[in-house]
Amino acid sequence: MKRIFIVATLSFTSLCSLYGYANEKDYEVIESNLSQTRYFSLGMNGFVGRISEGEVAVIDILKSKSATNIFLRIANNPKATPESKLYAACGLKQLGKLNNNDIKSIFEKEWDDDVSILKADILRKEKFKHLYFGILNHGCM
């Protein structure tokens, strides 16, 4: 019985480590999807309390060796949504790469934009700059 438990535990552990691994092509898809996200949301949302796809993407990108570069590409991408740029700011803050000097240089175009945010099950609009300062001062995760 003990041997079966050990084999099952080792099998489960090896499958979990394979599941957690993503190659660079996977990160390209994650980056592309995150760049087109239409709302910004942190924490549990909706009736069943789910984490948003954007937040899951940030968590996945943080596992990458090139996380800083991915978040900077999103932040500097003129086709990326303002919501995705807030997720990029979250990732950069988590990595310790976001500071007051980045405010106007990276996010100048989005500064006065309205951003769709989802809190619980309420979708509303807020100014990019207000959300950005919240990220800068308090982080996201």
PLM feature spans:
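Bacterial N-terminal signal peptides
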Residues: V7-S14
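Alpha-helix N-cap/helix-start positions at coil->helix boundaries
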Residues: A80-P82, D113-S116
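Amphipathic alpha-helical scaffolding segments comprising HEAT/armadillo-like alpha-solenoid repeats
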Residues: N23-F40, S64-A75, L98-D112
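Positively charged n-region of N-terminal signal peptides that target proteins for export
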Residues: M1-I4
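Alpha-solenoid helical repeat scaffolds
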Residues: Y87, L118-D121, L131
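Residue-level detector of extended alpha-helical repeat arrays and alpha-solenoid scaffolds
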Residues: I51-G54, S84-K85
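HEAT-repeat alpha-solenoid elements in large eukaryotic scaffold proteins
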Residues: T37-I51
